Swiss-Prot record:
GO molecular function (one): 14-3-3 protein binding
Biological source species: Mus musculus (Mouse)
Quaternary state and interactors: May form homodimers and heterodimers with TMCC2 or TMCC3 via the coiled-coil domains. Interacts with ribosomal proteins RPL4 and RPS6.
Subcellular localization(s) per the UniProt record: Endoplasmic reticulum membrane
PANTHER family given in the database record: CEREBRAL PROTEIN-11-RELATED, TRANSMEMBRANE AND COILED-COIL DOMAIN PROTEIN 3
Region (Disordered): 1-24, 234-280
Listed transmembrane segments: 409-429, 450-470
Keywords noted in UniProt: Coiled coil, Endoplasmic reticulum, Membrane, Phosphoprotein, Transmembrane, Transmembrane helix
Protein name, entry field: Transmembrane and coiled-coil domain protein 3
Length: 477
């Protein structure tokens, strides 16, 4: 064994069994792959017990992962609530449009007020949910950015603490634990594996025993050579470390042989061998026994080295498997995160499209309402034009009827005047006929009337000359 420092680590599994149980339950609950090492490894009649513990860095990593998962669940829940609110708002808009299309002005005003209240309430709730969603996204980004650095720092701190405690505990146990050769043979090292380091409790005690007895495990070959050259008459030889093998001088009598044997334990609990007997056979038997024990120790050391190498290989394999699993989990997490981002972007695009469709529907409804109002206005204007035309036509008809009545009255009056004039003419003619009729009774009367008329005509024709002549006669010069 190249040294005893290989086994100087701390087994913290037995110091806190409650913490071990909690860590194990957390690991099992979150599907962590634990080291699957055999429970018992038989080497030289010793039992090897394997235990494991989960470091605080992995727990912090799982804590960050749990927080991130809970935030993602909250984000999905808030997103679904936003979709529900938007769906209800769209339903309210459709219902409002349906009711407004078949309602009069008063009902339309009331429906509009109710719709505005509902729309404001929905918009307020959607705004609150969006703020909450932004807060969750911000917290998730903070956890993703700060959680990894924090967990790596905690892992480094925990590893330093473990190394410090391992050195302290190894020093204390090396000073206080009782060691003896028989106990080292009966109790072989028990191995407990604590990720990311593995710990050998009893191998540490055994290494301390070898180091305290022979100085170092490297001095076993030197001890073998020295024991082969050992003789009872040889001077005391020190084999390094804190233990020595002393050969005392022979006693002169059998009493001294019976009472001269003494063995004392040194400060490390190792037996110091003295020259208790004068017989070379006894000393050679002891040497053979020690050599046999050293061979067993060497075989045990070789087996321990093989076990350590096998555990190293298995640990590397398990570590690679865990690293690969963590990489796969990280890849799956990144893929799920990308899918979540894509889903969020899709929902945002759908929300934007719905907003655009709602705006276009509002514009369409407003345009249709404007077109309908314009058509109604044009119809009203055409009706008013027709009514005005009918009124003018009626007035013209009334005027024509009035003119016709007046013409009839005037015609009647004219006819009456003509009749009256003809009546007067007839009266005059009849009167003249009455005057003329006596003059036309006989030829003499006719001639007389003719001559009278002729004279009257001449007299009328020469009336001016007659007047002049009369004036000349009447007015003298």
């Amino acid at each position: 064994m190249p040294g005893s420092d290989t086994a100087l680590t701390v087994d913290r599994t037995y110091s806190d069994p409650g913490r071990h149980h909690r860590c194990k339950s957390r690991v099992d609950r979150h599907d962590m792959n634990t080291l699957s090492l055999p429970l018992n490894i038989r080497r030289g009649g010793s039992d090897t017990n394997l235990n494991f513990d989960v470091p605080d860095g992995i727990l912090d990593f799982h804590k960050v992962k749990l927080n991130a998962d809970s935030l993602r669940q909250k984000i999905l829940k808030v997103t679904e609530q936003i979709k529900i609110e938007q769906t209800s708002r769209d339903g309210n808009v459709a219902e409002y449009l349906k009711l407004v299309s078949s309602a009069d002005k008063q009902q339309a005003g009331r429906i509009k007020q109710v719709f505005e209240k509902k729309n404001q309430k929905s918009a307020h709730s959607i705004a609150q949910l969006q703020k909450k969603l932004e807060q969750y996204h911000r917290k998730l980004r903070e956890i993703e950015q700060n959680g990894v650095t924090r967990s790596s720092k905690d892992i480094s701190k925990d590893s330093l603490k473990e190394i410090h405690h391992s050195l302290k505990d190894a020093h204390v146990k090396s000073r206080t634990a009782p060691h003896c050769l028989e106990s080292s043979k009966s109790s072989m090292p028990g191995v407990s594996l604590t990720p990311p380091v593995f710990v050998f409790n009893k191998s540490r005690e055994f290494a301390n025993l070898i180091r305290n007895k022979f100085g170092s495990a490297d001095n076993i070959a030197h001890l073998k050579n020295s024991l082969e050259e050992f003789r009872p008459e040889a001077s005391p030889r020190a084999y390094g470390g804190s233990a020595t093998i002393v050969n005392k001088p022979k006693y002169g009598s059998d009493d001294e042989c019976s009472s001269g044997t003494s063995g004392s334990a040194d400060s490390n609990g190792n037996q110091s061998f003295g020259a208790g007997g004068t017989s070379t056979l006894d000393s050679q038997g002891k040497i053979a026994k020690i050599m046999e024990e050293l061979r067993e120790i060497k075989v045990t050391q070789t087996q321990l080295a093989e076990d350590i190498e096998a555990l190293k290989v298995q640990f590397k394999r398990e570590y690679g498997f865990i690293s690969q699993t963590l990489q796969e989990e990280r890849y799956r997490y990144e893929r799920l995160e990308d899918q979540l981002h894509d889903l969020t972007e899709l929902h945002q695009h759908e929300t934007a499209n719905l907003k655009q469709e709602l705006a276009s529907a509002e514009e369409k409804v407003a345009y249709q309402a404007y077109e309908r109002s314009r058509d109604i206005q044009e119809a009203l204007e055409s009706c008013q034009t027709r009514i005005s035309k009918l009124e003018l036509h009626q007035q013209e008809q009334q005027t024509l009827q009035t003119d016709a009545v007046n013409a009839k009255v005037l015609l009647g009056k004219c006819i009456n005047v003509v009749l009256a004039f003809m009546t007067v003419i007839l009266v005059c003619v009849s009167t003249l006929a009455k005057f003329v009729s006596p003059m036309m009774k006989s030829r003499s009367h006719i001639l007389g009337t003719f001559f009278a008329v002729t004279l009257l005509a001449i007299f009328c024709k020469n009336w001016d000359h007659i007047l002049c002549a009369i004036e000349r006669i009447i007015i003298p010069r």
